[in-house]
Regions:
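Conserved alpha/beta core of the MobA/IspD/sugar-nucleotide pyrophosphorylase nucleotidyltransferase superfamily
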Residues: 1-3, 155, 162-257
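Conserved N-terminal catalytic core of the sugar/cofactor nucleotidyltransferase
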Residues: 2-5, 13, 27, 31-96
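Active-site glycine-centered loops adjacent to acidic/histidine catalytic or metal-binding residues
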Residues: 9, 100, 228
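Short alpha-helical oligomerization interface
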Residues: 19-24
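A structural signal for short hydrophobic beta-strand segments in well-ordered beta-sheet cores
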Residues: 25, 144-146, 216
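Short, well-ordered beta-strand micro-motif
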Residues: 27, 88, 145, 174-176, ...
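Conserved beta-loop-beta/alpha segment of the NTase-like Rossmann-fold superfamily
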Residues: 60-141
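Conserved core of the sugar-phosphate nucleotidyltransferase
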Residues: 105-186, 257
Length: 257
């Protein structure tokens, strides 16, 4: 098992915090976002880690990682960044992580152990967090519907009702070589322009429409997404509450507890 962190973007909604470095190097709760991701992945006993760089690539140099580059980071989207790591995706099962999220190592462990060619983690306890982040949580949330067997049924559409959202996609997934082959086959059918602008949830929905099975792993909190300076302020405040369900931090001796 390997891990790939998608860190090519600037994070324009972070304001001037990303003038000099990419979003993943934003300081949060005493570490950078990237540090939190690397620590969680390593605590889940995954040692081979690659980072896909783009904006201000020279600033991303943590020890023990290899690099892939997306030189077109400014004109492409997340799926194009993922494809820059195809060398790994073709050979081994890979945990894929966005670079603007933090999460408990146990979520990574559960994802790594779950069967399936394409598997995604999702948060069943998303609504309280989104209600804190947004005046109307539905302004940002997207549909997430499951089949009776727990596989993904649909994802990524706008909605005006909470009943269309059975969980929040987290930006954390696992892809096997066979799963990546299915993704590559789909991407070959798309125009270059559509490929360049394809986001991850749109890719997942297209895969579903092609008949691809996507398995899911539920979690209840213990992660969060940092998308703005407002998020940073909110989370720094919530970390003072011992009962905050989305506190992702862990004691190194208690990861497997």
């Amino acid at each position: 098992m390997r891990a790939i962190i998608l860190a090519a973007g600037r994070g324009s909604r972070m304001g001037n915090l990303t003038d000099d470095h990419p979003k993943c190097l934003t300081q949060f709760a005493g570490r950078t976002l990237l540090d939190w991701q690397l620590e969680a992945i390593r605590a889940a006993e995954i040692r081979d880690i690659a980072v896909v760089r783009g904006y201000r690539a020279e600033t991303i140099n943590p020890a023990g990682c290899i690099w892939f580059e997306n030189p077109q980071w400014a004109s492409t989207n997340m799926v194009s960044t993922l494809a820059c790591a195809s060398q790994w995706l073709q050979r081994d099962d890979c945990i894929v992580s966005y670079s603007d999220i933090v999460y408990h190592p146990k979520i990574v462990q559960q994802l790594a152990l779950h069967p399936g060619e394409i598997v995604i983690s999702y948060d069943k306890a998303w609504l309280p967090l989104w209600s804190e982040r947004f005046e109307n949580p539905l302004d940002d949330a997207e549909t997430f519907r499951l089949q009776n067997n727990g596989q993904l049924r649909s994802i990524g559409a706008n909605t005006r009702t909470v009943t269309d959202i059975e969980g929040q996609y987290m930006g954390l997934l696992k892809i096997s070589p066979n799963g990546w082959q299915q993704i590559e086959t789909l991407l070959e059918k798309l125009s270059k322009e559509k490929r360049n602008h394809l986001d991850m949830t749109s890719l997942l929905q297209l895969l579903l429409e092609e008949g691809t099975e996507i398995n899911t792993v539920p979690t209840h909190g213990r992660w969060c997404e940092v998308d703005s300076e407002t998020d940073l302020r909110l989370y720094e405040h919530m970390l003072h509450h011992s009962d905050w369900a989305h506190d992702w931090r862990w004691e190194k001796t208690a990861v497997t507890a």
